[in-house]
């Protein structure tokens, strides 16, 4: 909160290997008074340094990057204090396995790069407030993967002990709605 009672803007770090994409996201977020970009990096290794030096409220990262990709970065963050910073995966990959793996590794949100500015800002604010976000169009495949009975009829099993941020029964129930 600011001195006049307004909420402070959410501080964001953008990690994406495509410079033009980072510039575009930064420019779009600058249109909102509710979010401020405090740092950016072109790969996961540089991203870890930027996170440590800026202490953002939310980290926004791509999955596929040189030197250290998004999933490897999430693995690396798990053992650090920065693991408490909500992470939003913003990517072009709508693969169910990638989504589930990112969530298992601690990502709190997953959006495709075709979202609107309003959707992106709302997702950042939701994560900063402690919530989770998965782009609505992606939930159908996730629900099938998380369902009790896949098409083969054999129950699926997931190891919920892999991550402290694994989906809870209630979160799965909400996804099914």
What are these regions (language model features)?
Residues 34-42, 50:
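Short hydrophobic/Thr-rich beta-strand motif most characteristic of the beta2 strand and flanking loop
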Residues 54-60:
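Active-site beta3 strand of CheY-like receiver
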Residues 21, 61, 66-67:
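The feature encodes the CheY-like receiver
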Residues 98-104, 108-109, 114-165, 169-173:
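Short, flexible helix-to-coil linker/hinge segments that flank and couple to helix-turn-helix
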Residues 43-46, 67-75:
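Acidic catalytic/metal-coordinating carboxylates
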Residues 7-21, 25-29, 167:
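Conserved acidic segment of CheY-like receiver
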Residues 93-94:
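Short, conserved "switch-loop" micro-motifs in signal-transduction and mechanochemical regulators
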């Amino acid at each position: 909160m600011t001195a006049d009672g307004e909420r402070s803007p959410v501080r964001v770090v953008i990690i994406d290997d495509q410079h033009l994409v980072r510039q575009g996201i930064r420019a779009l977020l600058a249109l909102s008074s509710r979010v401020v970009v405090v740092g950016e990096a072109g790969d996961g290794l540089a991203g870890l340094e930027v996170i440590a030096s800026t202490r953002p409220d939310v980290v926004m990262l791509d999955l596929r990057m040189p030197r250290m990709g998004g999933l490897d970065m999430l693995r690396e963050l798990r053992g650090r204090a920065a693991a408490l910073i909500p992470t939003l995966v913003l990517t072009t990959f709508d693969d169910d396995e990638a989504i589930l793996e990112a969530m298992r590794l601690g990502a709190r949100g997953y959006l495709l790069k075709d979202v609107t500015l309003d959707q992106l800002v709302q997702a950042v604010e939701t994560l900063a407030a402690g919530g989770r976000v998965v782009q609505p169009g992606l939930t159908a495949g996730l629900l099938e993967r998380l369902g009790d009975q896949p098409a083969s009829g054999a129950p699926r099993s997931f190891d919920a002990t892999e991550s402290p941020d694994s989906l809870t029964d209630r979160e799965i129930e909400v996804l099914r709605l």
